[in-house]
Amino acid sequence: MELIGMVLVAVITALVGPAGLEYVKAKLSKSTSKDIVKDDIERNLVIFDEISEIRETLNADRIWISQFHNGGHFLHTNKSIQKFSITYEDVKPGIGSIIHLFTDIPLSLYSRAMNHIMENRYLWIPDFKDETVATCGLKSAAEATGTNATYAIGLFDIVTDKCIGTMGIDYRTKKKLTQVQKDFLIERGSRLAGYLSIYLKSK
């Protein structure tokens, strides 16, 4: 176990830097009780606090995290159906929640967007109404949720580098983030990915 811990520390340091490492260590160093429900709530609150801070810093209307999961099997085969659900969300006062709209969604419905994120590690859409901007099949979802700009990044496992989900911020009006703001989103997303990776492996 000690060796595994050393490997994790080395990986986290390489991927998210010393600042990210200190953050993860601080959050995970809290003693856990034998009450798994209480532990789960406390860990979820850490994530909610983090995404709330990101949303406020970037003045976004909404921030969300989606995670991949299995969702049953196809009728005549044992092949599992890959799905995703929004598992965390924070919204500005007066903005509607979308978490209930994106539960058990087949990944195949958003293949183009997910392929773009897996290849580039992010997807920037500053204006859904701009025909020159590639929206990767997300325009209908944007219209349904009143979104006019989205900045999404992939969340990658700190050990395997496999995509475990996505994090995105939405705006009701078109929005062009600066490179500094994009870098901030990517850095904080990497930090959250590290936390989620360890969190999922500890369950």
Annotate each predicted stretch with a short phrase.
Residues 4-98, 202-203:
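Intrinsically disordered, low-complexity terminal regulatory regions
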Residues 43-50, 107-111, 186:
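Well-ordered, non-membrane alpha-helical segments in soluble/globular domains
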Residues 58, 145-146:
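A structural signal for short coil/turn segments at secondary-structure junctions
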Residues 83-145:
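Regulatory sensory and allosteric helical modules in signal-transduction proteins
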Residues 163-203:
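Juxtadomain coupling helices with adjacent low-complexity linkers
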